[in-house]
Amino acid sequence: MTHLLITGARGQLGSDLVARATSAGLPVTGFGSRELDVTDADAVDRALAGFAHDAKGDDVSGTAVVINASAYTAVDAAETDVDAAYAVNESGPAHLARSAARYGIGFIHVSTDYVFPGEGTRPYEIDDPTGPKSVYGASKLAGERAVLATYPEAHVVRTTWVWGATGGNFVKTMAILEASKPTITVVDDQRGTPTYAADLAAGLLELATHPAPGPGGVLHLTNSGETTWFGFARAIFTELGADPERVQPTTTDKFPRPAPRPAYSVMSPAAWVAAGLTPLRSWQDALSAAFAAAPEVFRPAPAGV
């Protein structure tokens, strides 16, 4: 049996990883930032030593895997909070990878489309040149490199446009705006793939429990298909039972931000599929399924509640 340790367990992806692992009957330990500061090398080493000991003591034939879902994700704030971004996104993964290698634990590190320049016209493959345009992207790329330099058998899994039931995200923001504004404008010149955190968690657990053959390295995992933020917003309005025409297109230059956003973030699943792993369903099917299963999660609470 696979024993799991999830870092960033209180976040959008981490909470779904813990929930999915629990429902699958897998032994799982979840650490949020309060329980484990990934930037503290000694704390990380103690945590992973204890995890390895407990996992091997419980099941001598089992395996132990750490999935790192912790990250500094404040893209704009990272432009000025550089040291903090690198501490969490580079040093943290390096500490985890080093201790995982030391104790014979599998390691999966979650990364991002922001490592690419965002100027492509076809889905990015795992070996396409990187070239981040923001501090956030550069810190995540530094983390990828630190992980694989320290622990070549580890897996780095890049994803994009993640949304889910936990915390704030684009879907919940659109629901709030739908309830409060007659019309909204959303950029139509940034293209990517909305990825449902629950689906992403399922894919990562498949990788953890049925490792890809061969050495470690980079993989891409997103829902399938592509759209723009404008197209995604209109699909959300449709799921809310609202008129999608209330969403109007605009361009990125109308919304200047401290950190540049990639114009193109679509990533190819070819390496994931070639490894014998299951591709994720379309982003449209994931959105519809999420609303059908728990519509109240993605709708703003009535005033006064």
Label each residue range with its predicted role.
Residues L148-G192, A198-D199, L205:
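NAD(P)-dependent short-chain dehydrogenase/reductase
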Residues G203, H210-A259, A294, F298-V305:
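Mid/C-terminal beta-alpha module of Rossmann-like enzyme folds, strongest
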Residues T2-T22:
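N-terminal Rossmann NAD(P)H-binding glycine-rich loop of SDR-like oxidoreductase domains
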Residues T80, A87, S91-H95, R102, ...:
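Catalytic helix-loop patch of NAD(P)-dependent Rossmann-fold dehydrogenases
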